[in-house]
């Protein structure tokens, strides 16, 4: 069914106060491979790129932080390596960290940059290794070359944003000696949002949002607080791969990021629905 001119105008009018509110504000968006579940990769990526470009064109300052877990696992399988995870983090030996670098920096990052740049040369790919962006420390000897964020130097990101570009960040960090570490992209997104004093931190995933009862869609949490999320992690309601996302939301909001969101990246234009409509979508943490 076609949309009438009046309905189209109403959509634009509804977006106007949000365009004003978020003008010149940083929004960090974590784009993960799981956000592509249920849709063709090309279509999902093109729609995501359109959202990012529109956000930039109306005066927002988006930063994209990406994962690549499914792609890393796929290449590992082709090479005969078995992926192992503990609490949502990949166990990473020396060969695996090289595979992660190849996939994140050499495959996923250029794909995202190219998709955004279809609409104009505004995206620039960077790695956490560039300009000392992500300084890493080992997380746990049992995880191998899996790192935690020691500190973020946002200088290169601020320079790109000030020049009108959209940074697209691959989440490989290095320690003081230059050793590369694979860092969970959810964790990096939260740390970058804090370093840039972001207005919003957004996670795109393959679920509609957070639930109080895992198997009950009616228990979707529309709005929550860091304290409630702490309780849901403590009682096991939030577990597995969702833990890094939720921990990062909690830490970022407590550190001064105004809003954090968990959205279903399979929904077309979900970013625009969250940012520019009255109802919003998914789960908001504040």
Predicted regions and their residues:
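Nucleotide/pyrophosphate-binding catalytic subdomain
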Residues: 1-266, 273, 277-279
């Amino acid at each position: 069914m076609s949309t009438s001119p009046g309905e189209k105008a109403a959509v634009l009018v509804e977006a106007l106060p949000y365009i004003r509110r978020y003008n010149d504000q940083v929004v960090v968006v974590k784009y993960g491979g799981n956000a592509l579940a249920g849709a063709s990769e090309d279509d999902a990526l093109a729609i995501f790129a359109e959202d990012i470009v529109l956000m930039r064109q109306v005066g927002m300052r988006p930063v994209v932080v990406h994962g690549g877990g499914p792609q890393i696992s796929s290449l590992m399988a082709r090479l005969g390596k078995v992926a192992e995870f503990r609490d949502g983090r990949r166990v990473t030996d020396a060969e695996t960290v090289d595979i992660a670098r190849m996939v994140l920096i050499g495959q996923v990052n250029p794909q995202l940059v190219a998709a955004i740049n279809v609409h104009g040369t505004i995206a620039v790919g960077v790695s956490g290794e560039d300009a000392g962006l992500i300084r890493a420390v080992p997380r746990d000897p049992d995880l191998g070359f899996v790192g935690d964020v020691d500190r973020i130097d946002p200088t290169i990101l601020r320079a790109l944003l000030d020049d009108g570009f959209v940074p697209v960040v691959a989440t490989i960090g290095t320690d003081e000696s230059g050793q590369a570490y694979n860092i969970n992209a959810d964790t990096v997104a939260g740390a970058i949002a804090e370093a840039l004093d972001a207005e919003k931190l957004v996670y795109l995933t393959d679920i509609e949002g957070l639930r109080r009862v895992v198997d009950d869609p009616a228990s979707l949490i529309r709005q929550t607080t860091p304290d409630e999320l702490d309780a849901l992690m403590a009682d096991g309601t939030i577990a597995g791969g969702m833990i890094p996302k939720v921990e990062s939301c909690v830490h970022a909001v407590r550190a001064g990021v105004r809003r954090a969101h968990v959205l279903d990246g399979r929904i077309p234009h979900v970013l625009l629905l969250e940012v520019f409509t009255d109802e919003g979508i998914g789960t908001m943490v504040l």
